[in-house]
From Swiss-Prot:
Residues that hold Zn(2+) according to the record: H108, H112, H118
Annotated protein name in UniProt: Endoribonuclease YbeY
Lineage per the UniProt record: Bacteria, Pseudomonadati, Campylobacterota, Epsilonproteobacteria, Campylobacterales
Major subcellular location class: cytoplasm
Highest taxon of source: Bacteria
Keywords attached to this entry: Cytoplasm, Endonuclease, Hydrolase, Metal-binding, Nuclease, Ribosome biogenesis, rRNA processing, Zinc
Listed cofactors: Zn(2+)
Example of a GO MF term: metalloendopeptidase activity
Function: Single strand-specific metallo-endoribonuclease involved in late-stage 70S ribosome quality control and in maturation of the 3' terminus of the 16S rRNA.
Co-factor binding details: Binds 1 zinc ion.
Keyword Nuclease: yes
HAMAP family xref list: Endoribonucl_YbeY
One cellular component (GO) term of this entry: cytoplasm
Record flagged with keyword Glycoprotein: no
Length: 147
């Protein structure tokens, strides 16, 4: 299996990188940087890049490139930043594992890197999330939350 996720885990959260790789490879063959951080650091990024001064669950930073055929040039897709604090809190709240919550946030971030935007696409991104959640046998509590 070709590794496409470059992991920078700045926390103690356990990360099932093989499971995330399978999800990523079902959607792209381009490299993805995945940063797992805490609420303090993600709040700083949220403030700097989105003008929102609060922590959030996941941020995506697509790599802008002038090429039309990006995959030909092996250019990375971008960076996904996930808050381990949110992963732990939401897993507890919704009654599923931290790994399942991490997978959901990874899927959400990856779809943003691929150009989906739930704020403007009339449900297209949510539908794609649902399909991936079902394809990988993730708990229905992840789907319900996204409706």
């Amino acid at each position: 299996m070709h590794t496409i996720i470059e992991l920078d885990n700045q926390t103690t959260l356990n990360v099932d990188i093989e499971a995330l790789e399978k999800i990523a490879q079902s959607l792209t063959n381009r490299e993805i940087e995945l940063i797992i951080t805490d609420n303090e650091n993600i709040q700083e990024l949220n403030r700097e890049y989105r003008d929102r001064d609060n922590p959030t669950d996941v941020l995506s930073f697509p790599l802008e490139t002038p090429f039309t055929e990006q995959s030909v040039f092996d250019i990375p897709l971008g960076t996904i930043v996930i808050s381990a604090d949110f992963v732990r809190e939401r897993a507890k709240t919704y009654g599923h594992t931290e790994q399942d919550e991490l997978k959901l946030l990874f899927i959400h971030g990856l779809l943003h890197l691929l150009g989906y935007d739930h704020e403007t696409d009339e449900g297209e991104m949510r539908q794609k999330e649902r399909e991936i959640i079902e394809e990988f046998g993730l708990p229905s509590s992840l789907i319900i939350r996204n409706d």
